[in-house]
Amino acid sequence: MKHIRNFSIIAHIDHGKSTLSDRLIQECGGLTDREMAAQVLDSMDIERERGITIKAQSVTLDYLANDGETYQLNFIDTPGHVDFSYEVSRSLAACEGALLVVDAGQGVEAQTLANCYTALEMDMDVVPVLNKIDLPQADPDRVAEEIEDIVGIEATDAVRCSAKTGIGIKDVLEVIVEQIPPPEGDPEGPLQALIIDSWFDSYLGVVSLVRIKNGILKKGDKFKVMSTGQNYNADRVGIFTPKQTDTTELKTGEVGFVIAGIKEIHGAPVGDTLTHSKHGAETPLAGFKKVKPQVYAGLFPISTDDYENFRDALNKLSLNDASLFFEPETSSALGFGFRIGFLGLLHMEIIQERLEREYNLELITTAPTVVYEIVQTNGETIYVDNPSDLPAVNNIAEMREPIVETNILVPKEYLGNVITLCIEKRGVQTNLVYHGNQVALTYELPMAEVVMDFFDRLKSTSRGYASLEYNFIRFEPADMVRLDILINGDRVDALAMIIHKGLIRSKGLALVNKMKELIPRQMFDIAVQAAVGSQIIARSSIKAMRKDVTAKCYGGDVSRKKKLLNKQKEGKKRMKQVGNVEVPQEAFLAVLKLND
């Protein structure tokens, strides 16, 4: 056991986590040069295309250290995005230490801080590594100072390496062996194994990634899942090198996979404990805190026949993604679908893309909303995440919106732009600290403003240099109303949104004009209106296409023309009563992109 090292790699987006893990794998001979591909661990197509890590992946490598001993390194490559921070905390639960990778050119960014604090809260040893020292703009000394100044961990003798060119990779491996403590646990005791991750394989059933805390799990052992009490047989156990490799047993302190032919999708939930069926452990291990979805949106299959497949796909995805929440929903405009809870907008995009690619579904998304706390006049408090579920105005005593605390790190030359943006988004500044060239800003912002397009706007006002992380703090009373869109007098439930009272005029007008562009012209006039309650705020008409019915009257009497025109008018009137308007997919998405 003293030769095992479990660690995670944590860093801000694009500071080189996945490239560093590639080098570690190559250095330790996990894959031959021929099998090597850039970002080996990013196995999903989406991850490769966007160049981001979404799922944490684990790898077991053998490393011959300078002291002549061979060490087993189990490491987990983690995502850097705000939306996936739960993935990071999950991987950290399986480790004793973490490598904090910092780009020697960019320096410390918000996510570096957020992930590092998560690790320090779990009492883990954090080892700083300065990456990308081959870049011309790299300034390792300044960055080492920044780490000490902003993060507060010793960094003067931090390892310097370049994952791209392979400089200093040996030093990184040595530091891991020296500075990260070996796992603790009782190899003789009853089995306790923590499920870090699981996914569904159509041939093998549920595959679970586990970290053995105490005891030993052998191939063929009978074990039970502690939360459900179900018993299974360990058909295969093994490790990822990063190829799936079968072994005969997993020992205390190791990280590996178990396949037990579990067919039902929620048979082995993430964060659960496995133990032997006979003489097992009495108590489960402390799991993970459940993450609450922050943003909700409706997803509907374009053809109603896909509803069943959509449900199966969501079930399979939710096994792999513990933060996904969903419940059935019906909409008069879009039919049957699901209301799904996400951690943020990136998460929402990724899930929609995975559903469309991996399960061949075609989906329509409605505008995302956050959860509001509503105190009704009868004293009851309810939580609403769907504009259609909002009670009648006269039943609402008070409406409270979620407020998040946002930490923004930005170079001082862009400070003014960022402050202007935060004020525009109804933010309240609570703190501002200068660290050398960087400024740390703390704002309290309404979550609804942050999840819509705050991240994109922040990046564009600061030329991509600002970085942010946020967490929910409380609900606060606010003047919020529901804005409805009426098409020919009918409410379209999928276009409703909850917004601040001060914005209804501008938002209503913008939305109505956008709809006017996007809804195709019909043979009759269409009225598009924005309303709050029964009060109409903005309106625009989509003019009818018109056939020239008098073209065939050459010369002739005016009464003849009048007769034809009146006949056309009657027809249009009849059409308008029975005609219904198709709202295209772009119109639903327009709600998201109002500020452009």
From Swiss-Prot:
Required for accurate and efficient protein synthesis under certain stress conditions. May act as a fidelity factor of the translation reaction, by catalyzing a one-codon backward translocation of tRNAs on improperly translocated ribosomes. Back-translocation proceeds from a post-translocation (POST) complex to a pre-translocation (PRE) complex, thus giving elongation factor G a second chance to translocate the tRNAs correctly. Binds to ribosomes in a GTP-dependent manner. This is Elongation factor 4. The keyword Oxidoreductase does not apply. It comes from Shewanella pealeana (strain ATCC 700345 / ANG-SQ1). Signal peptide: none annotated. One of its GO terms (biological process) is positive regulation of translation. It comes from the Bacteria. GO terms for molecular function: GTP binding; GTPase activity; guanosine tetraphosphate binding; ribosome binding; translation elongation factor activity. GO terms for cellular component: plasma membrane. The gene is lepA. Belongs to the TRAFAC class translation factor GTPase superfamily. Classic translation factor GTPase family. LepA subfamily. GTP binds at residues 14-19, 131-134. It is found in: Cell inner membrane. It catalyses: GTP + H2O = GDP + phosphate + H(+). Its EC number is 3.6.5.n1. Keywords: Cell inner membrane, Cell membrane, GTP-binding, Hydrolase, Membrane, Nucleotide-binding, Protein biosynthesis. It is a peripheral membrane protein.
